[in-house]
C-alpha cells in the first residue's frame, strides 16, 4: 500500500503520516514535506526514486509522471488497467494528501509582483487532486488537515490488513473528493480573478475621480466570472426563520464578513446585511461619523468637526429618528470611547461596529449580554472596497463597479455641480447638501434625505414614487424640517415634490437633474425662492 504526501500546510501531517506508516503504508513524498517527515523519524521514498526522474525546472516538475498518475488513475477491477501497471512497473497509490501553494495569501500582499504570483500557481499538486478525485472509488484524497483526525482514527482501528481503506465508506470518499474538487475550483477562481484583474475599482482609480461620484472607471468585464468565496460558518437561519443560510467570505479582504466579534451572540443573516450597510455608510466620511441603520437604511447619521465630538455626533444621529433607532445597528468610523459608550448604553441596539474600542468602553458595553460588538479596523479608512457589486438573478447574475466614495473638501467634491436657480445656496447650505447627497447613496430608492448641520433630519426611502418619499420626510421630520436641505437620489419627474418642499419650508435642494421636465422643476424652485443644484450624477440603490 502506498500513500503520496505533498503539502504546503504541514499542520498535523507528521502525526497522520505516523499512523499510515504503522499500518504498513509506503510513504512517498517530495521537497519540504519529505524533509519534515524524515526529520521526525519517518521513512520516506522520494518521488524522484519512484519516477526515476529528478525534480526539474526549479521544482516545477516533480509529480507529473506516468508512474505517479498511472498509480492514481488505474481501476483495479479492469484487467487491462492491471496489465498496464504490470507492464510499466507502476504500483497503485491508495491515499493522496495534498494542499496547494498559498496563492491567495501571496497576491493579497500589495508588494507581490506578477512573477511572484505566477510562481505560486500550483501545477503538480492541483493535478494530483484532480486525478485522485476522479478515481475516488479507489483512492482516498485528503486536502483539509481537519480531516486527518477522523480518517486517522478509522485507519488505525481497521482490522482488515489487506484493505485498510475499507474503514472509509464509499460515500465518505465521494464527499472527500467533492471537497478536493471544490478546493481546486476555488484555487483556479483565485488565479483567474488575479490574472483577469476583476478588481473593478481600486484606490488609484477612485482617486482619479476625486471630487465626483461619477463611476468613470475603465472596466472590461471578463467573459467568464468566477466569484471566490469560502464558507465561514452556518447561520442560525436566513432572512426569515424558515430559510437556511450560511456566511461566505472572500479570502484576503476585510469587510463585515471578516469582522471580529468581541462580545455577544453570533451574527444573524439580517445583522450581517445591516452591519454591511452601516460599514459602507460611515466609510463615506473622512470626519468622525456615526450612523444608525434599520433594515439596511440609515435612519440617523451625523458627522463632527473633530474626533473629540464622537459622543455628541452619536446623540445627533440618534435624535434623527429615535423611534426607529430602537433595535438598530450602530456604525462608527473612529475608535469608540467611554463617553460615547455611556451615551448609548441605555438604548437597545443589535450590533455596534467600530474600528476599535477603548478598554473601558468595551468593558461597559460588554455588560449588555445580547449586544454584538464588532471590530472592523477598515471602518476608519475612506477607501473604496475593490469587490464588484454582484446581484444574483433568476438564471444569472449582474455585476457592476461600486458607486465610488466622494472625496475631497467642499470645493473639490462639488466642483462639477451646477446651480440652476436664481438664488444660490450659502456655504453652510452647500455643506449640508454635500452631506445629504453622500447619505442618499446609502438609502433605498426612491430616496429623499433631509439634513441640517450635517445631520439627518428625516429620510424617505424605498417608495414607488418620489413625492411619497418627500411626504414621508415631512411627516417624520415634523418641526425639524424647517430650514433643512433636501437631497434626491434621482431627478424629479414633476414639480409636485418642489411644492411639498416649499410647504415644509425646505431651504435648499440638490438632485441629479436630467428630466424632460427639468425646466418645470426649476421654475417651481424659482417661484418659491428655493436654491437648487444639479449634480449630473444619479444615486439609485435598488
From Swiss-Prot:
Q: What is its EC number?
A: 2.1.2.3, 3.5.4.10
| Catalysed reactions, as listed in the record | (6R)-10-formyltetrahydrofolate + 5-amino-1-(5-phospho-beta-D-ribosyl)imidazole-4-carboxamide = 5-formamido-1-(5-phospho-D-ribosyl)imidazole-4-carboxamide + (6S)-5,6,7,8-tetrahydrofolate; IMP + H2O = 5-formamido-1-(5-phospho-D-ribosyl)imidazole-4-carboxamide
Q: Where is IMP annotated to bind?
A: 30-33, 60-63, 122-123
Q: Does the keyword Cytoplasm apply?
A: yes
Subunit: Homodimer.
State which gene encodes it. purH
- Which residues are recorded as binding 5-amino-1-(5-phospho-beta-D-ribosyl)imidazole-4-carboxamide? 236-237, 295, 327, 350, 446, 466, 491, 538
What is this protein for, i.e. what is its function? Answer: Bifunctional enzyme that catalyzes the last two steps of purine biosynthesis. Acts as a transformylase that incorporates a formyl group to the AMP analog AICAR (5-amino-1-(5-phospho-beta-D-ribosyl)imidazole-4-carboxamide) to produce the intermediate formyl-AICAR (FAICAR). Also catalyzes the cyclization of FAICAR to IMP.
Its family remark reads: Belongs to the PurH family.
What is a single cellular component term in the Gene Ontology annotation? phagocytic vesicle
Which GO terms label this protein's molecular function in UniProt? IMP cyclohydrolase activity; phosphoribosylaminoimidazolecarboxamide formyltransferase activity
Residue ranges spanning the membrane: these are none
Localization: Cytoplasm, Cytosol
Sorted alphabetically, the Gene Ontology BP terms of this entry are: 'de novo' IMP biosynthetic process; purine nucleotide biosynthetic process
Instruction: Give all residue intervals belonging to the MGS-like domain.
Output: 1-143
Q: What is this protein called?
A: Bifunctional purine biosynthesis protein purH
Q: Where does (6R)-10-formyltetrahydrofolate bind?
A: 496
Amino acid at each position: 500500500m502506498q500513500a503520496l504526501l505533498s503539502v504546503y500546510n504541514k499542520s498535523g501531517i507528521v502525526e497522520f503520516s505516523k499512523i499510515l506508516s504503522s499500518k504498513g503504508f509506503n510513504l512517498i513524498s517530495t521537497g519540504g514535506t519529505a524533509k519534515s517527515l524524515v526529520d521526525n523519524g519517518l521513512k520516506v521514498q522520494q518521488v524522484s526514486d519512484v519516477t526515476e526522474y529528478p525534480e526539474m525546472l526549479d521544482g516545477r516538475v516533480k509529480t507529473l509522471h506516468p508512474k505517479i498518475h498511472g498509480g492514481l488513475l488505474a481501476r483495479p477491477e479492469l484487467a487491462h488497467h492491471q496489465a498496464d501497471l504490470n507492464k510499466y512497473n507502476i504500483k497503485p497509490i491508495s491515499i493522496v494528501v495534498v494542499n496547494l501553494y498559498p496563492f491567495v495569501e501571496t497576491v493579497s500582499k500589495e508588494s507581490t509582483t506578477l512573477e511572484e504570483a505566477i510562481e505560486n500557481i500550483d501545477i503538480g499538486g492541483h493535478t494530483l487532486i484532480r486525478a485522485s478525485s476522479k478515481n475516488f472509488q479507489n483512492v482516498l484524497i485528503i486536502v483539509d488537515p481537519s480531516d486527518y483526525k477522523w480518517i486517522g482514527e478509522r485507519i488505525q482501528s481497521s482490522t482488515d490488513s489487506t484493505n485498510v481503506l475499507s474503514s472509509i465508506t464509499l460515500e465518505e470518499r465521494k464527499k472527500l473528493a467533492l471537497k478536493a474538487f471544490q478546493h481546486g475550483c476555488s484555487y483556479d477562481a483565485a488565479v483567474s480573478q488575479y490574472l483577469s484583474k476583476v478588481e473593478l475599482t481600486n484606490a488609484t482609480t477612485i482617486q482619479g475621480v476625486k471630487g465626483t461620484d461619477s463611476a468613470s472607471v475603465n472596466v472590461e468585464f471578463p467573459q467568464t466570472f468566477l466569484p471566490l468565496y469560502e464558507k465561514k460558518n452556518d447561520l442560525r437561519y436566513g432572512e426569515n426563520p424558515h430559510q437556511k443560510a450560511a456566511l461566505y467570505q472572500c479570502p484576503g479582504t476585510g469587510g463585515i464578513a471578516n469582522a471580529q466579534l468581541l462580545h455577544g451572540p453570533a451574527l444573524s443573516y439580517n445583522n450581517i446585511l445591516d452591519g454591511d450597510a452601516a460599514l459602507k455608510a460611515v466609510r463615506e466620511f473622512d470626519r468622525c461619523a456615526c450612523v444608525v441603520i434599520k433594515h439596511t437604511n440609515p435612519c440617523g447619521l451625523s458627522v463632527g468637526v473633530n474626533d473629540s465630538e464622537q459622543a455628541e455626533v452619536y446623540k445627533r444621529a440618534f435624535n434623527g429618528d429615535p423611534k426607529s433607532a430602537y433595535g438598530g445597528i450602530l456604525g462608527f468610523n473612529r475608535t469608540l470611547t467611554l463617553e460615547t459608550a455611556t451615551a448609548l448604553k441605555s438604548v437597545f441596539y443589535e450590533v455596534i461596529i467600530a474600528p476599535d474600542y477603548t478598554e473601558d468602553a468595551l468593558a461597559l458595553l460588554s455588560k449588555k449580554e445580547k449586544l454584538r460588538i464588532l471590530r472592523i479596523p477598515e471602518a476608519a479608512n475612506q477607501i473604496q472596497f475593490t469587490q464588484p457589486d454582484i446581484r444574483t438573478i433568476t438564471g444569472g447574475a449582474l455585476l457592476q463597479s461600486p458607486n465610488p466614495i466622494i472625496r475631497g473638501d467642499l470645493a473639490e467634491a462639488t466642483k462639477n455641480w451646477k446651480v440652476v436657480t436664481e438664488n444660490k445656496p450659502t456655504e453652510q447650505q452647500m455643506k449640508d447638501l454635500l452631506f445629504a447627497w453622500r447619505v442618499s447613496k446609502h438609502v433605498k430608492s426612491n430616496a429623499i434625505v433631509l439634513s441640517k448641520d450635517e445631520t439627518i433630519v428625516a429620510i424617505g426611502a424605498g417608495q414607488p414614487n418620489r413625492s411619497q418619499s418627500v411626504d414621508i420626510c415631512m411627516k417624520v421630520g415634523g418641526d425639524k424640517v424647517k430650514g433643512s436641505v433636501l437631497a434626491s437620489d434621482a431627478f424629479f419627474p414633476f414639480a409636485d415634490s418642489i411644492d411639498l418642499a416649499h410647504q415644509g419650508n425646505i431651504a435648499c435642494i440638490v438632485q441629479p437633474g436630467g428630466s424632460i421636465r427639468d425646466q418645470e422643476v426649476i421654475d417651481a424652485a424659482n417661484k418659491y425662492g428655493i436654491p437648487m443644484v444639479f449634480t449630473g450624477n444619479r444615486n439609485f440603490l435598488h
